[in-house]
A protein has these predicted regions:
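Pyridoxal 5′-phosphate
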Residues: 1-394
């Protein structure tokens, strides 16, 4: 039985061209970038060339790119680094102790690593969660209303990893710049899928991940706009402008850069192809009785389809589809193994049973029309079969 992978939002296979670019850095150009000899300098050159390639994709300067081990680390560095810097600055100003805690704003549909980092910081900082509408869209005016003098950071996800909704990051960034508040966006799902310009979009901090764009796991980035100060989470040799001490993973970073290069060359045509397949999938799935689309009908990532079915559990759908050779998910790969309903879907106003009946299908570079047709043939049968035995039906 042929297996069809439709869970590209969870992770992507490494592109063979990326693999080939990485190979020399495992056994030939393996030097430590901090070493003065030729092995180290060759590695250092590859690192800096990769930094330039990645920076170019988002309109940043090379020195504004900090390589990390993952999007989770980048998001933690953005939130905690900003919070610790604010505390340090207040301490320098000899502010009263009661004034030490600043204010952080996030949305109610952030990735778990942002939610948990903010929760951890709430022991010393006030955290406000901005609600979303039924499509999972944040109203920039709600953010503007919540910003106050002690607000140190606004962190809003760019493209939802679960429902695919794209936020108006440019408008949010403009508001934050006018209010002189640092603005971070988690672009883990949008980076390498839609065009991003950090300068035009008024972004101060941006998170991205390699394994979401056909690069290797174990490497991510944090864009840090020139002039933005963060306190590092890791202390040691002072790599990555002192913000991320550790021996640099050159092979993975080279792979990340190659993945960015490949995306940039074919971005327009690939996005159009994915949108065509996505829209076909949505149109045909919504013909199934009791089906509804989650997320915004238009402002969504080009590869994301998230639907729900009356009287059908998402976990059952995933298992039955897997038996037919199709890999999908119920939501975020970081939480879909639990039985808890998605906090993202609940934030859009769905009831628990509706959130439990959702299925996320995400397309990618190797998704074909034939794959989509196969899923469209199998899915109605699977939904009908599960519905027949559903305890919720009557």
């Amino acid at each position: 039985m042929k297996k069809i992978y439709l869970d590209y939002a969870a992770t992507t296979p490494v592109d063979p061209r990326v693999e080939n670019a990485m190979l020399p850095f495992f056994s030939k150009k393996f030097g430590n970038t901090m070493s003065l000899h030729s092995f180290g300098q060759d590695a250092k050159l590859a690192l800096e060339q990769s930094r330039e390639t990645v920076a170019d994709l988002i309109g940043a300067k090379a020195n504004e790119i900090i390589f990390t081990s993952s999007a989770t680390e980048s998001n933690n560095l953005a939130l905690k680094g900003s919070a610790f810097e604010a505390s340090t600055e207040l301490s320098r100003m000899s502010m009263p102790k009661s004034h030490y805690a600043g204010h952080i704003i996030i949305s109610s549909i952030e990735h778990h690593c942002v939610v948990e980092a903010a929760k951890w910081l709430s022991r010393g900082f006030e955290v406000t969660k901005i609600p979303v509408d039924k499509y999972g869209t944040v109203n920039p005016k709600d953010i503007e209303r919540e910003i106050r003098p002690e607000t140190i950071l606004v962190s809003i996800i760019h493209g939802s990893n679960e429902i695919g909704t794209i936020q108006n990051i440019s408008e949010i960034g403009k508001i934050c710049r006018q209010k002189k508040v640092c603005f971070h966006t988690d672009a883990s799902q949008s980076f390498g899928k839609i065009l991003i310009d950090v300068k035009k979009m008024n972004i101060d901090l941006l998170t991205a991940s390699s394994h979401k764009i056909y690069g290797p796991k174990g490497v991510g980035l944090l864009y840090v706009r020139e002039g933005i100060k963060l306190v590092p989470l890791l202390h040691g040799g002072g790599q990555e402008n002192g913000l991320r001490s550790s021996t640099v993973n050159v092979a993975a970073i080279v792979g990340f850069a190659k993945a960015c290069e490949i995306y940039k060359k074919g971005a327009k045509s690939e996005n159009q192809r994915l949108i065509r397949l996505r829209d076909k999938l949505i149109k045909e799935i919504l013909k199934i009785k009791g089906s509804r689309l989650n997320g915004h009908p238009k402002n969504r990532l080009p590869n994301n389809v998230n639907v729900r079915f009356d009287f059908v559990e998402g976990e059952s759908l995933v298992i039955h589809l897997d038996l037919h050779g199709v890999a999908c998910s119920t939501g975020s790969a970081c939480s879909s193994a639990t039985l808890e309903p998605s906090h993202v879907l609940l934030a859009t106003g769905l009831r628990h049973e509706e959130a439990h009946g959702s299925l996320r299908i995400t397309l990618g570079r190797w998704t074909t029309e034939k794959d989509i047709n196969y899923l469209l043939n199998v899915l109605p049968k699977v939904v009908g079969k599960i519905r027949e035995i559903s305890p919720f039906k009557n």
